[in-house]
Amino acid sequence: MNKKYLRDLMNNDLSPLIKDTGIEFYDVEYSNNNGKNILTFYIEKDDGLISIDDCELINNKISDKLDEIDPISDPYYLEIASVDITTPFTRDKDFKKNLGNVVIVNLYQKLDSKKEFKGILTDFNDTEISLELEKKEIKIERSNISSIKLSLFD
């Protein structure tokens, strides 16, 4: 399933349905777990406290629209999940929030013969990020980042 298509669906078709809730979509993911197709929407609130009632509310608000659009031809389970410390980030506001923190960056293509880096996120712009490694700083093109998330251990 095309990630861009799912993000466009989330941003253009589903976000307006939850606008009045104080809850925002963070990201969307389509996966297969033990033969079960799962469409997961990650949600967040400014205060960071997502309850089971919030998940149920969002599920109820978007289910009918998903049935109408029918974005996935195969049967799937709809899952609404909260963002946590292990959730990869992609938005500028997430990069800004994590400046100065230790992050783990996974790449599509190797850079300096490595596909994973762990370092301090020191800067970012529309096209690249800067990481401070042990003795040097490197720049990584954002288009080459498959995932970036906060490191649980420094």
Swiss-Prot record:
GO BP term, example: translation
Keyword Cell division: no
Subcellular location(s) of the protein: Cytoplasm
SUPFAM superfamilies to which the protein is assigned, alphabetical: YhbC-like, C-terminal domain, YhbC-like, N-terminal domain
InterPro entries assigned to the protein according to its UniProt record, in alphabetical order: Ribosome_maturation_RimP (IPR003728), RimP_C (IPR028998), RimP_C_sf (IPR036847), RimP_N (IPR028989), RimP_N_sf (IPR035956)
Pfam entry (one): RimP_N
Classification via HAMAP family: RimP (MF_01077)
Protein name as annotated: Ribosome maturation factor RimP
Originating species: Finegoldia magna (strain ATCC 29328 / DSM 20472 / WAL 2508) (Peptostreptococcus magnus)
